[in-house]
A protein has these predicted regions:
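Hydrophobic (often cysteine-bearing) scaffold residues that line and stabilize catalytic clefts
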Residues: 19, 38, 42, 53, ...
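Conserved pre-motif C helix in the palm subdomain of viral-like polymerases
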Residues: 92-123, 138-141, 165-168, 217-245, ...
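Conserved short loop/turn motifs at secondary-structure junctions
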Residues: 40-49, 63, 127-134, 161-167, ...
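Short helix-interrupting loop/turn segments at helix-coil junctions
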Residues: 1, 33-36, 55, 67-72, ...
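Conserved catalytic palm subdomain of right-hand nucleotidyl-transferase polymerases, strongest
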Residues: 33-41, 79, 89-99, 137-181
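Inter-domain linker/hinge segments that demarcate the starts of reverse transcriptase
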Residues: 16-28, 56-63, 110-115, 139-151, ...
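Surface-exposed loop/turn segments and immediately adjacent short secondary-structure elements
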Residues: 1-91, 106, 330, 468, ...
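Short linear motifs embedded in intrinsically disordered, charge-biased segments
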Residues: 3-12, 187, 204-224, 228, ...
Length: 521
């Protein structure tokens, strides 16, 4: 089938009427317990509909699709202010969440499922936010590998971490419809998307009291299933228009930016190049109705020498920092992951202190409940981003100490009881945390080997930077570390890793058999 025929077939699917099976699938995936919108229809009501009820709901959606208009309740948002911290009399200390009609959100999800196959092939690889099969780990690995290789060959990397002011709320809707047209969203599908915004309005609800309705003419609808994909399309167009020749060369690739929704990192090999890239990006943002926050955007240089990186936006100088937290992980100008691991241990200790009396040692709380909190809060806090760590014996010892600090207290023990860690884990039926970390690292290695050509993490994984290594012992590379881990723990030599991990089912079954690391614990 030719590309023209494929496009026509794709268009006929997305422009066709909405089948009941599609509505049923979306309704079944609704999460129970969610707050209703202005119509007070809860997700449980929709999930309890029988075949007849779903057929009537489908008829309603097809009327909206055919006429290009929706009920007013679907266009109405209920804004509920949530207190953050500080003075309760200050409006800036509240964050508003918007509750939308559940039937309207189901309709929006149906539209989102039709938009995805059209726009996904058109969105640049540099954007990983709100995209299926991608997450923060993709960009965290890409940036880590880029900095690792650049440090090895003494190539400086100039970075600007860009913060956009209230990006979701500033998207001009008129411009957005034009961008959607450019990206192939046209005809009845575009009309259906616009229908959710045509008479957009909101009210504020506080302690049961409601304000008067007021119109909303700009920005994306908070809480709408359509908003994420609409936003990344709009950001992709800004990124495309601001793209230039600058960037950081890594093997055969030149990487100039990384985007995760509105989290933007601009990359260049010199301060001058980075200033040019930032100037273009700022101009495109301004033209698209967005503004860069100069107080929150920061510059950083990853280099063996201290290098100044003065950057300006609109005549204002950006701060230059020695470390920056990107997507939840701390990156430093020296590129050492030890600072991030230390921070993770410190943050997890703070979490344990905050719940010590109310959870950890509370006798009225069952062990099952305590371990549930351990798995859902403590472990993710301690190990976020662990797939990228290069573990040493010191690191393993510190991670195990942080792990057992919590588990001993759950078991009602202390170090003075001189009970082995393995005994405590066996009693609590908890998997060793180091085993979880190593299994995840090897799982990510297999994922990188299997990534198709064109995916950025896979490309930098396979690429080798060029240049001359300076004198001295090089740092341990993540790939060397995890290859050695596979050899030590699974008996797979480095030259066979790609072949073995290339079969996902085989690799997953091997990892499920990974035994705990032998040791004194």
């Amino acid at each position: 089938m030719s590309s023209t025929e494929e496009a026509e077939a794709e268009g006929s699917v997305v422009d066709s009427s909405i089948p009941q099976a599609e509505v049923t699938e979306v309704v079944e995936k609704l999460l129970s317990g969610k707050a209703p919108g202005v119509d007070e229809i809860r997700p449980e009501y929709l999930k309890s509909l029988d075949v007849v009820g779903l057929s009537w709901l489908t008829r309603l959606y097809n009327i909206a699709w055919r006429l290009g208009t929706v009920p007013l309740d679907w266009q109405t948002g209920v804004v509920v202010p949530l207190f953050k911290k500080g003075d309760r009399r200050m409006c800036s200390n509240y964050r508003g969440i918007t509750l939308l009609s559940l039937p309207g959100k189901v309709y929006a999800r149906v539209l989102e499922r039709r938009i995805r196959p059209i726009v996904e092939p058109r969105i640049q690889e540099e954007q990983c936010g709100f995209r299926p099969g991608r997450g923060t780990l993709d960009h965290l690995y890409t940036l880590t590998r880029l900095l690792e290789g650049s440090w090895e060959f003494a190539q400086p990397v100039h970075m600007c971490f860009v913060d956009l002011e209230k990006a979701f709320d500033c998207v001009p809707r008129g411009d957005l419809w034009g961008v959607l047209w450019e990206y192939g969203v046209r005809g009845p599908l575009l009309r259906a998307v616009r229908s959710l915004y045509d008479r957009s309005r909101s009210l504020v609800r506080i302690a049961g009291s409601k304000s008067d309705l007021f119109p909303v003419h700009v920005g994306l609808r908070q809480g709408c299933p359509l908003s994420p994909v609409l936003f990344i399309i709009y950001m992709d167009r800004i990124s495309r228009r601001s793209r230039g020749p600058e960037g950081v060369r890594f093997g055969d690739h030149r990487i100039s930016s990384l985007l995760f929704a509105d989290d933007v990192v601009l990359l260049a090999s010199s301060n001058q190049d980075l200033q040019c890239a930032l100037g273009r990006f700022a101009a495109e943002c301004e033209a698209a109705g967005m503004r860069i926050s100069t107080s929150k955007s920061e510059a950083m240089v990853h280099s063996r020498k201290r290098v100044a990186c003065p950057l300006q936006v609109g005549g204002e100088l950006l701060s230059q920092v020695e470390e920056f937290k990107y997507l939840g992980v701390l990156f430093t100008s020296e590129g050492r992951m030890e600072r991030e691991i230390d921070r993770r241990i410190g943050v997890s200790s703070a979490v344990m202190r905050s719940i010590y009396r109310s959870v950890v040692v509370k006798k009225e709380l069952s062990r099952k409940a305590k371990l549930s909190i351990y798995q859902s809060i403590y472990v993710p806090t301690l190990t976020y981003g662990h797939e990228l760590w290069v573990m040493t014996e010191r690191t393993r010892s510190r991670i195990q100490a942080a792990e057992m600090s919590f588990l001993r207290r759950v078991a009602g023990r202390s170090l003075r009881d001189r009970v082995r860690s393995s005994v405590t884990r066996e009693e609590l039926r908890v998997e060793p945390l180091l085993l979880h970390i190593e299994r995840s690292q090897l799982r990510w290695l297999g994922h990188l080997f299997r990534m198709p050509p064109g995916r950025l993490p896979g490309e930098v994984f396979r690429a080798y930077p060029t240049g001359r290594r300076p004198w001295g012992r090089p740092r341990a590379r993540w790939r060397d570390y995890v290859s050695r881990l596979a050899w030590e723990r699974l008996g797979i030599p480095p030259e066979e890793l790609e072949e073995v991990s290339g079969e996902k089912e085989v690799w997953v079954s091997l990892l499920s058999l990974l035994p705990p690391r032998p040791g004194p614990g």
